[in-house]
From Swiss-Prot:
Protein name: Glutamyl-tRNA(Gln) amidotransferase subunit B, mitochondrial
The enzyme's E.C. designation: 6.3.5.-
Primary location recorded for the protein, binned into one broad class: mitochondrion
Leading EC class: ligase
NCBIfam families per the UniProt record, alphabetical: gatB, PRK05477.1-2
Function, in words: Allows the formation of correctly charged Gln-tRNA(Gln) through the transamidation of misacylated Glu-tRNA(Gln) in the mitochondria. The reaction takes place in the presence of glutamine and ATP through an activated gamma-phospho-Glu-tRNA(Gln).
Keyword set includes Nucleotide-binding: yes
Key word rRNA processing present: no
Length: 654
């Protein structure tokens, strides 16, 4: 085959057009009639391949039939989950806690985690990568490719050194020993998403070895793994760099398109030792690894956005009188491409139960690769397990060894950010948050919700310090403000994206919207605006209901733009709409409490004998809220006044 002209090569890279010559000569496929049998359940569609590139801006993975709008991905997933639940409706489902063990059997799990490195370069080509932050502007398919990504004959890999730094950070975060010399190898297999016929990875000499991850009860491990106050240590066998594959865009008619923008993206593969014996602990391990990689700035896109996926290797063996029946582990199966923590736990439970049932019936577990779908109750066979011989690993002759000096490793260690365990302890001790709330902040939006929390707290504390000398800001007041901020960012902000509010937006002609939280802590509602609302709420200048109304008004685009993200904008909006809290005077509180007791005097006998049942007291407070001007009543003050009035009346009755 002769040299390909530059014009034809450019046309192929940019538009997907292949000129008919030599081995690239196109053959016309015979036309086939499409009948109902092509869509029968259980009959796979025939695959056809086109050289035509998809139109720019196409980002979905499926193409609808002509004339029909593309279904929303969320709707597809919900429909699949509902269908799976309907099929399993008659089956009794055990709770997660009950599903961690099966009497008479030991589960063993090893995990391989693939995470995309935080860099804008591909591993072996100069082509850029799509931004991990701007999800609203996806690049056109096949627009971020270089000749090497397409395995054009004559092209060679060029190791991009910028990808090495986040990889070393990942290894350090996992307590691994970074190897002074590592090398790249070819893993041979044939699939349409790998045009070269092999993947470049690190099999014989990986980047790092012998690490570990410590898990505690607060990380969500199984109750059976909690004990003695000591953390559960999961060993990390190795960390290696490797290429990602192209993305397949599948259509219902059996045609598949390939997007090579992702081909060659730098990944780290993290391989654990088979130290995990409970499904919940496996999910906790993946969750903890994601947090560690994010804190190290090695991988900033987590499972929520597809930047991290897990493969789990599952095996079982019998246990008799607390001892395993064999020193050798059972035959393992691999479940590929799990994209959520819940999927990791559920897939392991399903595969464990399948293997146990098979062995109880006298069957044999085969070494194979299996898949898992959202909402499923069973794993499904994908293919027979390929052994090491099938991959034909060999050193890559086009790439030299990677040399890493110890001084580089020490420098990266010294510049690492705060690790998750230390940060969680600080959130609990200094910010007053519960471990559960602190963990939620650290996990949501790949840590972006926590950064938004920090920004809001800083802005709120600045407002409290600047409010004047008339009110002293105490340490206790600051902690209460931090707790208030955490509750709002976790719970109240979450209600903005509830189904009820989304229906209200749709009724108002507005499109569905999420919070828009980025990894830097930015969001549709700015931290400054939220801090303004919380400042007025914390200082009792507005009520809880008013504060929520302000938040919803901003999110649902009811509040005019001139009040949003402007100095004192929230304060002006409250003033212009007369929303300030004008509390009752002490005399008005007392008069209201007296009038309520006049109507409910029969309740007083419940308080005789120095007994003050809280339920009865709150009933009277509720009557105060109902009888008076609710927007002017502080519940805490009303409770105190009502208690004083009750004590006075009870004393007079003696």
């Amino acid at each position: 085959m002769g040299r390909i002209p530059t014009r034809e090569l450019s046309s192929y890279l940019l538009t997907g057009r292949v000129f008919s010559r030599d081995c690239t000569r196109l053959q016309r496929l015979p036309a086939r009639n499409i009948s109902k049998q092509h869509f029968a359940v259980g009959q796979p569609a025939q695959r056809r391949w086109n050289h035509t590139a998809p139109e720019a801006g196409h980002t979905t993975t499926t193409q609808p039939p002509p004339g029909q709008p593309a279904p929303h991905l969320r709707k597809i997933l919900k429909d699949q989950a509902k269908a799976s639940k309907a099929q399993a409706k008659g089956k009794k489902k055990r709770s997660s806690a009950d599903n961690q063990t099966v009497p008479g059997w030991e589960l063993t799990v090893g995990i391989e985690i693939h995470a995309q490195l935080n860099t804008d370069r591909k591993l072996f080509s100069p082509a850029p990568l799509a931004s991990t932050e701007d999800n609203t502007r996806a690049p056109a398919p096949n627009s971020l490719v270089a000749p090497f990504d397409l395995a054009i004959p004559g092209t060679q890999p060029l190791f991009q050194q910028a990808t090495l730094v986040p990889a070393i950070r990942a290894a350090v975060a996992l307590n691994c020993a970074v190897q002074p010399v590592s090398s790249f190898d070819r893993k041979h297999y044939f699939h349409w998403d790998q045009p070269s016929g092999y993947q470049i990875t690190q099999y014989y000499a990986p980047l790092a070895r012998d690490g570990y991850v410590d898990l505690r009860a607060r990380d969500g491990i199984a109750a059976q793994d909690v004990g003695g106050g000591e953390p559960l240590r999961i060993r990390v066998k190795q960390v290696q760099m490797e290429q990602d594959t192209a993305k397949t865009l599948a259509r219902p008619d059996g045609v598949h398109w390939l997007d090579f923008n992702r081909c060659g993206a730098p990944l780290v593969e993290i391989i654990s030792e088979p130290d995990i014996h409970h499904p919940a602990t496996a999910a906790a391990f993946v969750r903890k690894v994601q947090m560690l990689l994010g804190a190290a700035d090695a991988c900033v896109v987590g499972m929520e956005k597809g930047g991290l996926r897990a493969d789990v290797n599952v095996s079982v063996r019998r246990v008799e009188d607390g001892k395993t029946s064999s020193a050798k582990l059972g035959q393992r199966t691999e479940i590929k491409n799990l994209f959520s923590f819940k999927a990791v736990e559920d897939a392991i439970i399903a595969e464990r139960d399948r293997q146990i049932k098979l062995l109880d019936e006298g069957g044999v577990v085969l070494g194979e690769t299996r898949g898992w779908s959202l909402g499923s109750t069973e794993t499904r066979r994908l293919r027979g397990k390929e052994g090491e011989v099938d991959y034909r690993y060999m050193p890559d002759p086009d790439l030299g060894p990677v040399l890493v000096g110890q001084d580089v490793v020490e420098h990266l260690k010294s510049t690492m950010g705060v690790m998750p365990d230390q940060e969680l302890d600080d959130l609990v001790s200094s910010y007053g948050l519960s471990e559960k709330d602190a963990m939620s902040l650290m996990l949501l939006e790949d840590g972006g919700r926590l950064q938004f929390y920090y920004k809001t707290v800083d802005a709120l504390e600045q407002r409290l310090q600047n409010q004047g000398d008339s009110t002293k800001v105490t340490a206790e007041s600051l902690v209460q403000a931090r707790i208030l901020t955490g509750n709002w960012i976790l719970h109240v902000l979450g209600s903005l994206t509830s189904e009820n509010n989304q229906r209200d937006r749709a009724a108002a002609g507005l499109s569905e919207r999420d919070l828009g939280v980025t990894s830097e802590g930015d969001a549709f509602i700015s931290a400054d605006d939220l801090a303004d609302i919380l400042f007025f709420l914390h200082t009792s200048r507005i009520r809880q209901g008013t504060a929520k109304d302000l938040l919803f008004a901003m999110f649902n685009e009811v509040m005019p733009a001139q009040y949003i993200s402007t100095p004192a904008g929230i304060e002006r909006y409250i003033t212009d709409n007369d929303l300030w809290f004008s509390e009752l005077s002490p005399q008005e509180y007392s008069e209201l409490a007296e009038s309520v007791l006049d109507e409910e005097e029969h309740v007083l006998k419940e308080f005789m004998g120095a007994r003050y049942p809280q339920g009865k007291l709150m009933f009277l407070v509720g009557m105060m809220m109902k009888s008076g001007a609710r927007e002017r009543i502080d519940p805490a003050t009303a409770q105190k006044v009502m208690r004083d009035v009750v004590e006075t009346r009870v004393a007079a009755m003696k």
